[in-house]
Structure formats: C-alpha cells, structure tokens
Swiss-Prot record:
Annotated source species: Drosophila melanogaster (Fruit fly)
Lineage: Eukaryota, Metazoa, Ecdysozoa, Arthropoda, Hexapoda
Biased amino acid composition, Basic residues: 1468-1478
Protein name (database record): Fanconi anemia group D2 protein homolog
Localization annotation: Nucleus
PANTHER family xref list: FANCONI ANEMIA GROUP D2 PROTEIN
Signal peptide limits: none
Amino acid sequence: MYKQFKKRSKKPLNTIDENATIKVPRLAETTTNISVESSSGGSEENIPASQEHTQRFLSQHSVILAATLGRTQSSSRNIATLSRQPNNFFELVLVRAGVQLDQGDSLILACDHVPIVSKLREIFTSASSYTDKMETFKTGLNAAMAPGSKLVQKLLTGCTVDAAGEEQIYQSQNSMFMNFLMIDFMRDACVEVLLNKIEEVAKSDRVIMGKAAIPLPLLPLMLTQLRYLTASHKVEIYSRIEVIFNRATESAKLDIIANAELILDASMHDEFVELLNINYSSTEDLFHMTTVQTLGNLSLSDRTQAKLRVRILDFATSGQCSDAILPHLIRLLLNVLKIDTDDSVRDLIGSLRGIFNWRHTNETEKISASEDSKKSQLELFGFLELGLIRSKKFYQACQRSSASVPAAEFTSFDMILLLLLIHVNEDNSLYIENILRRRIKLEHITVSILEEIRQHYRHILEQHITTLMNILHDFMREKNRIVSDFAKSSYSILFKIFNSIQKNILKKLLELTCDKSSPHLTTMALELLRELQRKSAKDVQNCATLLIPMLDRISDLSLTQTRVAMDLLCHVAFPDPNLSPCLQLQEQVDMVVKKQLINSIDNIKKQGIIGCVQLIDAMARIANNGVDRDEFIASVENVDSLPDGRGKMAANLIIRTEASIGNSTESLALFFEELATVFNQRNEGTSGCELDNQFIAWACDLVTFRFQASFVTENVPETLKGIKLEYQLNINELDDTDANTESDVLNIGINISKLVLSPKVKACDSIYVLAPLFNYVRVLYKHRHQDSLESINALLGCAIVLPSFFEDDNYVSVFENFEAEQQKDILSIYFHTVNWMRVSISAFASQRDPPTRRRVLSRLGELIRIEQRMKPLLARAPVDFVAPPYQFLTNVKLSNQNQKRPGPKPAAKLNATLPEPDLTGNQPSIADFTIKVGQCKTVKTKTDFEQMYGPRERYRPMEVEIIMLLVEQKFVLNHQLEEEQMGEFLGLLELRFLLEDVVQKLEAAVLRHHDSYDADSFRPHLAKPEDFICDLLPCLHEVNNHLITLGEAIDNQLTEVSHVYSNLDLFKDQFCYIKSCFGLCVRLFALYFAWSEWSDKSQEQLLHKSLLKLQPKTQWKRLEKQSVPQLANLTFQYFLKYEKSVLNLSTAVHLHRLLCNLLKLGSLQSDASQPRFQQAEDLRILCGTLLRRKWFHYSGTLDKGGQCNIYLDELVKGFLKKSNAKSQTELLTELVKQCSILNTKDKALTSFPNFKKANFPLLFRGLCEVLIHSLSGQVSVDSRGDKLKLWESAVDLLNGLLSIVQQVEQPRNFGLFLKHSLLFLKLLLQHGMSALESIVREDPERLTRFLHELQKVTRFLHQLCCHSKSIKNTAIISYIPSLRETIETLVFRVKALLAANNCHSAFHMGNMINRDLHGDSIITPRSSFAGEENSDDELPADDTSVDETVLGDDMGITAVSVSTRPSDGSRRSKSSSRSKCF
C-alpha cells in the first residue's frame, strides 16, 4: 500500500483529530509511546491585520494546519514510481506536487498540506502560459469531479500524509480539494466546479456514491468543502444553493438541510428558513427530524422564530407529531431564550402549555416501546431543564405562570414543571410548596393529577420522585384537612406506581407515626399504612421487618391508634396463607400483647385486649377452599376438639385474654365489642380468606350459653329498691308459629332491671356486657348460618323486665316522687333498654322474612317512642346523673376532659362534676323504699327538628345493617302511623330516625366528624369507610324516591299557601317532619358525594353506579354507557330543580354543597362536552336566589344567630365566586340604594332580607374580597387591549364600596374597607403603572378622571386613619404604617410618570387637614382609652361567625405577593407625621 522500495511494517492508518498529532512508529523494531500534542493557540498573531481578505483564508488555514500537524518539513525523498502515467494536466500537477493517485482509497501526500499548497502555487506561477494552464487544470478538475470518476471520493475525503524523513504516517482530515481552495487564484474556479457538481448530483434520481472500497455518498462530501467559504462567498453560495435546493430530490434536500449550518453564513439563515417554508407547505414535511435538528442550530431573527413557532404549534397539535421528534421541536422553541425578552418568554410559555395540554386532551393514547418513550420523555424535559438553568427570566416566568394560571388550566404539565423548578433551584422550594399548598386548599389540584402524571410523565416523575416525596412529607403535617388528605392519597397512588420507592414511603410513614407532637398526624399515618397493607399486601409483606420498630411506640398511642397499628402488625405477622409470614414479627407481637395483658395499668391492659383481638382475627382467617357452609352447623365441644392450626391458636388466645381480664366489666365489654367489630369486617376485595369454620362453631356455642345464662330470664319479676318490675314490650305474639313455640317465647325476657338494681358479682353477668355480648353473638351466628339469625330471632321481640309505671300517662309525676338514687337507677334501666333495643334492631334489620321484619319495625317504633318519653325524665334527672356508657374505649380522665367544653353555664357546671358510673359489679345494699305519688302537671315536650338528641341523650349507635330498612321498606307520609300500618310501613318518625343515624355515620366516615362528647368513641362502622360507602349504594335509589315523595308534598303545600313562606301551615308538626326528612335526604347525598376517595381511579366504577342510581329506573339501561362526567351533569341538573322545595336555610346550604360536589365529580375526567362553566354559573345564580329569600326557623320565627350567619356566609361566597365586573357593579348599585335602611333598628335589606346591620359585614366582606380576587386574577392575564379599562372599572367598584361604608357607619366595615383598599393600592403599584404609562400621552384627561376617582378613596382612608387614631381603635391603627408607605410610594410613582411626560396638570398634591369621618377637624388626640376595644366587639354575641376565619381560603388573593398583615406598632414611616394624599 505504501512505497515499495522501503521496508516497513504494514500497520493500519490512524485517523487523527485536527487539534492533535498522533505519531505512529515507522520501524517495527522501534518502540515509542504514542503522544498527543496539544495544538498551540495564538498562532494567528503572525498574520498581518492588513492582509487582503482573499489571502487571509490561506494564511489562517495554513496556521491551523501547522498547529495540527507539527513542524513542517520539506521532503527530500524522490517521488515513487507511479503504476501509470498521468492522464491529463490535472493529474500531472498533482503528481508533481507530491501526490500519489492510485494507492488505496485516499490520496497519499509526500508532505503535509502546507508544502503541497506551496508546490501547487509554484507550479502555476512558474508556468509561462498561466491562464491557459489554469483553464486546462479546471477542465481536468471538472473531469475528476465527475460522479463516475475514480478520483472524486479521494479528492473530497481526507488524505494520507507520508512525509519523508519522519517516522510517522497519519490520516489527515483535510481533503485535497481543500488544498485547491487555499490558493487564491484557483478558488473561484474550484468553487464554480464544485457548485456545478453539487447541482448535478443533487438533481440525480438516485443517491450517487463514490468509487472506492467503501463508497460514500458524494453530495454530503461536496457540501462539506464549502464550510470555509461561508464568509468570502456567502452570497454566491446561497444563491446557487437556493437554485439547487429548488431542483433537488427529496433526499438531496435533506443533505443540503443537514449541512446548512456549515455552508451558509449566519446572515443567510433567515432566508434559508423562508426557502424551507416555501418548499414545505406541509408542516409534517417541514418538521423532518433532520430539518428540526438543523433549525435548532441556526441563528434566526425574532420574526423568523415567531413564524416557526406558529408552524410548530400547528404541527404539535395536529396529531402527526411523534414522540421522538417532539423533544427537538421543544428545543427549537427554547431557542427564543437567546432573545430573552418578557414578551418572547411569555409567548414561549403559552406555546409550551398549549402543546402539552392539547396532546393530553385530544390525542389518542399510543402504545410505544417503553424504552423509546422513556428516552424521548427524558430528552424532552432535559431540554426544558437546560432552558430553566440558562434563563433566569424563563425560570421566574414559569414560576409566576404556575402560580397564577386559572384552576381549570392547571394540568399535570404544570405539576411536573414545578418539580423541575425545585430541582433547578432548591432555594425556591418553600415558595413553590406554598403555590401547591394554596392550590390544593382551593381544590384546584386533586389526586387525579397524579393519575394524569402517571399516564403522561411516568418516567420524568420517577426521576424527580424524591422531590415530590419531600413535599408530600411536609403536606402530611398540615393541619388543613384537604392538604393532608391530598398527601395521604398521593402516597397511596405512588406506592402502586413505583416499586422502587415503596420502602421509602413506608419509612416516611413510620417516621410520622413516631411524631408525638400531633396525634392527628399519627392516626393518619397509621390509617394509611393499614390501607396500603390491605390494597398491596404482597408489597408490604416484603417490607415486614421495617414495621418491627413500631412496637416500641405502641405504649405512646391512644386506644384507637392502637387498634389501627395492631391491625396492621398482626395481619402482616399472620398474613394470608398464600403469603410468607414474618416469623420475627410474630414473636415480637406475641410478646408485646402478653406483657400488655398482665399489666395493671388500665390503659395498657386495654391496649393488650385490642392487640389480642386483632391477633385473633389474623390467626382465625384461613384460605377459602370452597367448603360447604353447612358444615358450620356442627358443634365443637371444647378447644381441644379443634384441629391444630391457626384456628386453634386463635381459640386459645381468646381463653387466655378472658383469663387476663378477670372480673373487669369494662375490659370484658371492650373485648366483646372489639371481637364483633373485627369479625364483622368484610375482606372480599382484599383477601380470599374467611374465618375458620370450626373456630366459629366453637365460639358461637360458647357465647350463646353465656348469654342465655346471664341475661335471659323466665322468673316472675319482683320489686327491688321499692320499684315494681314487670314484663313489658313483648311483641313476639306477632309471629305466626305453633303453640308450643309461642308459649316458650312469651315466657322469656331480658332481665335488664334486676341487673341494674341488683347487680351480680361476676363481670360476665354485668348489665354493661349485655349489648356488646349480643353484638358478638349475632356476628358469630351470621358467620355460622349464612347471615341467618332465625335460631335466635325470639330475642328480637321478647319481653323486657321494666318498671311498671313507665307506660302510665302520668309517668313523669311518678318519676319525680322517687328519691334521687331511685331516679338514677330508673334512668339507667331505660338507657340500657334503649341500647338493647338498638343493638337488637340493628342485628335483625337485615333479615328479610316478613314476620321478623314486622317485629323489627314494631320494635323501631317502640324505640322512638321510648326515646321521646325519656326527654322529660332527663330534664328532671338529678344533677349528678351520668348516662351508662355505651362504649368502653375512652379513659376516665379523657372523658372528663372532653366533657369540659364551652357551652351554656348550667350544662358546663353539670358536666364538670359528673362522676363515672360504677362498673365493678359490686352489689349495693338493698333497702325498701316507700313511694308517695303526688299530683304533677303533665309535661308536653316540644320536638326539636334541628337536633334530634340533646347533650344528655347518649345512646349506643345503630349498626350499619340498619340501612336495609331504607332499601326494602315501604314509606307513608304520616308521622303517626295507624295501628294497621305499624310493622308494615315506615312513617316520618322512622324515616327521620334512620336518616339521622346514617347521616351521623357518613359524617364520621367522610368528614371525620366524631362525637364531641366522646372524641375517642367506639365507631364500628369506621373500620373500613369504603365498605360503608359500598353498603349505602343500594339505598340511594330508595332515598331518592323518598326525596321525590317529600318534595312533591312540600310543593303541594306551598301551592296551597300561595308560596307565602311565613304561613303558619308550614310550621305544623306533620309538615315540619316532612321538611326535616327532606333536609336529611339532601344532606345524605351531599355527604355521600363529598367522599375524598372518589378521585381515586379504583372507585370510578362505584361512582358510576352511584350516579346511575339517582336516575329514573326506566333509563338505567340507556344511561349505563354514559361517562362519569355525563352522569354527574345529569345528576346536577336533577338536584338543581329542588331549589323551590327548600324551606330551611340548613337544607339550602346542604343543597349547595351537594351541587358543588357533583360539579367537582364532573371535572374528574377531561370531557369537552361537559358544560362545567354553565353549571358553575347556575350554582352562582342558585346562591343568589337563596340569599334573596327570607328564611324561617321550624318554630316559625325568623332564622338568626351564629349558625345562621355561618350558613349565610357560605351562600355569600358561592354567590360572589367568580362573578364578573358587570354583576359586581349591578349588585353594588343595588346595595348603595338600599343600605341606608340598615341604620333603622331591626330593619333588613330589601333584596337580601336576612341581612341586618349586625350581620351586614358578612355581605360587605364578600364584596371586598371578590373585587380584589377578580382583579388579581385579571392582572396576571396577558392583555393586548386597553389596559386602563380594567383599573377604571375596579376604581368604580371601590368607590361603590366606599359609598356603602359612608352610609352604614360600622367599625367592622371600616376595617374591611381599609384592608382591601390597601391590597388594591398594592396591586396598582405592582401591575397598574404600566397601564397609566400607556395612556398618559394618548389621553391625559382620561388619566385625570382616573386619578380623581382614586383620590376619593385615599382621602377617606386618610380621614379613617385620623379618626381611628383619635379614638384609639387599635385594629385600624396597626394598618396605618403600611398604608402610609404604600400611598407615598404611589404618589411618588405617579408624579414621576407625569413629570416624564410633561403632564403635571393632571395631578395635584396638597397637605390635608386631619379630620374625622364627619369632616370635623381633629385638633388634639383624645387621652381617653374608652374606645380602644377592637371593633369586632361591637358586633352582637350571635354574630361571632363574622370573623374572617369563617371565609376560608378560597377567596384568597393569588397575585399579591406583598404582605398585608398589620404592621408592628413600633414601625415608623420615613415621612413626616403629617399625611400627604392626592
């Protein structure tokens, strides 16, 4: 391959970099190290600045080559003998210059490039006929550059340098053609030949390749030769390239585009892009991958980038843009950051948001390779991250955009963008967290956004998951329930999405459980851990050992927290049989519960009981192998008869726990309640395990015997403590059975009175164990007999041993003649009776055979009647009487603390001294009391339709099964059923009772509203709230039917009274029950659809069924295929029609909440057909209609008070939410005309009859806040039109508020007006000055009018501050420094603006005299502090809800970053004490 006269080893050639020299040893026996010599910089200093431009090319290129190749040496070696003679003058010149033409695939040079160029120049300059020689050379070059020539690829590719006298051979990157271009007199001819050949090749129908062992496409090689001529021949090159491009084939065009950055001067880039736009009218053709990559490297003007941005948007939103090319389009868009102006950055963000939002709402999801998808997604956001790093203005604009974008436009892209912002600059993490926190509070962001991120940005989320986890960890600690719920649901979703972070999530949750500062946080973390274990048992089981340290924290937990923690630990220690158990955790749990059981401290022993129950449940659940359930009936004599296994272990643990409990009645009752709760839980959705059949049979026989022995009696009642007892309330005769059975049934009774009056020593015989034990019995029987309780149905209607006088008409008189101790015993008897009836009714409510159902309804009627009859007795009860406990979880100290709550003074005193009932079971001494009955007035108790139970009526909650009565029972519109209707129908009393119970359970499950008297109360239905929601599904249709019936009754009555809402017929008992039941139905639906888990995708099917149930049954089949948003829309329109049937303010508010929840459910999915904006407007109109009605209490009096104000406040917020300037102006105009009437005592507004002067600040505050809220939202939107128009309308509205303040002088209104005026002025300083600048020269008179209107406000503020200082009103004085500073800044800015535009006449500033609100001069401040109290104290006592905390956060200001808190009193303004206003 090389010269053949010299021996050398044939080593492969080394391709070198232009900036380095790689030396290769010539002799094989010589060993030298390869060295890389860095090129020297500063070689250009030897080139004269005065050298001609045409000569500088040669000089610069020669210097580069010299630096690259090292010291230039002349070759003393003779040229090798060629294998052939030169064919033409062109080849002869090359040979003479030292070029070998036919050796391999490249030209071999006898020396480096600079001597070659020198020899070529010498050959031509020394020739006699210079011009002819040049033409001959050009002809030969033209022939050599022909596509079919063997030399063309050699001329265009790098040469091999074999310099004589040097032990090196290297491959140069410069071609021979580049040597020709270095000679000034040859350059133009060579360029001409090159461009002609480029055109020839580009027009060819096929891709022309070179003639070499490895042929290469010729067009890219030819184009590369032009890269050093872009400055000297830019016009010529572009003009020819333009012609060539227009005539080239598609593949040739792509080659030209790919090399455009190198061959075209930067000044020609805009013209080239215009050429592309002309040639590619289709955006799909224009944005080829090659084109996009080239466009990203070109230097383009603003105008060209704007045109490209439009086409990019069209292409990205056309559905033709692939995921692979999108990152490069985004990179092309980000090139605008080179300009980095406010307008360009704003347009860029708008374009980015438009592209991402369109792709996620309109584009059908494509299935692509996961690796390709991951690569393109990471590449895309990598470009965005680089843009955020490169441009501070872009970073800040993205931050502001995410903070101010409307709620409807906040998408998963914005969420990812915020995570990127934190990643780029962690210093801003607190500010960005606050953005997210505020949006979550306002419910702009729900957990559904994580589902969107999982679908669209899974890979980038995984990259930034640590950042998100840190944010969620902080959000879990939030006191705001919405924020903490968001974090909780987010953890659950992330746990299912990413396996890699499951351990981290568990560790963070375990960390939160150890936080002693917040019990609520601990409870929430424990509940979330239990939820994760239920939904992802296998994943949690893999991390079982992480949970062991939780056992060390058990002693610090409350009893309810212990229940959740032990539920988690026990079911991980003893998981489903198909999962591997954690033996280490089993040993630790067993050891801990044994220690707790033998502990003498009551609370720790209860923890041990709760732990044992959870352990029993986990052990007793075995795999369901499809065994016939009839085998359950078989009896098991004792524990030893049970087969070895987990069932026998559970039975032994029950015996051990009972032995540890000993004679503690409270602990035994708690044990039975806990067992009933855990055994009653359903695990169909999370586990395939059921309780062991033989274990159930053993436990069932055991507790049945105990119950019969302790509480069922057949003895004749006797007189105890002077109280005559007898069998009462026996309804078993209603059962149609044979004579023998009936006689047996009629002879038994529940011995409640005897156990109260003469308690037994054993804890198992205590009256307090009656209800818990029966609850446990019925759960076991349902498991054993396939939900049938037929074998124990006699207990439902059997007699109860009660005092004989209770059925008398004068029972109150008889009760009052007893001694105090006897009265306590009698009341205890009836409390236990009510609790027994509640637990028995709940047990049999799910039984469907007609005789049992009749007894259930009859017993329910008796229960309601007894509870009503107890009300007058409780009113006359001894002061120290305490109702018997219905739950046994709360400690004594905790109970006393909970009872010390604010309220009426007598009740507070009563509750503070209540002793705890005796649960020891010790028998008191029996004495014979004589009774003297005297005359007493009959007492008629008035029904409270607002609150069903008073503070002393603490009854056991009904079980969940009670809802079956709502599903399967007929309803009649009577509050007192006829005799033949009893046992067959539900009346208004029964319906109200059932709805009230279900609503209370829903509040506990959905809103976590627990009993204020028993904060740690036993709530069986709360074990799994989702189960309760599922249980309610069947009854939705029936409750809706009841709602229709009640609504029709209300409408008919309204028609009869001609819609006069004050008519006395609307306040009769019968109609009040109808109104109460109607309100409870609406409240039930509102709570049901307020469940936070509806946003979880796993609940979508349940939500769909729930919404379908509320449609007419005839349309169910047709509507089955409707989406959730469509069904929510139909349901919204359905409930909206009930506005006319609402007669109570509380019902009106619950209807508003229901519609808000349905509106939110309609927004869970993206559905373009969903008319959400119209629904929001309908909701606003509804609130306005409700506010303009006069509301009356059930008693017929005008509704008022603190609760009324809270309801009115909620309607005001709904009415003013998102109202525009026009509606605000109309409302203000209306109020300005009417507000003067408020100065008259007890007069209300004509348009809003529920607002008097006392609660008018509610409405006024709403007007102030909606003005600032709407203004702050509009100033952040890009407005290209008249910017001053917005501020003119805002000042008009502010002056309307000023007019109201001046007419209705109320301290509360003064403070509200000052606070929001200060916010307005700060907004004007931040965003309004540009609007003033735009109008100052065009229309000075308009600016004058604006300043004049603003002057009215500032003058009043000045007078208000002076007046407040004179009367020492500290609430307003605290705002004065901040207000003074803001006004002075505004004055300075306005004066500077006018001075710069020579418009001084539009502004005048003078020193104002200090005056009070009535215009009188204030000479000296008053020394008295009589008026120093806060203005809030002037409001009446029933108006405490007017405080600003009631309003919440949803009317908060989004764009005002400057703090509006009252300034510190010590802060001094820099100006003089004399105020200056304009």
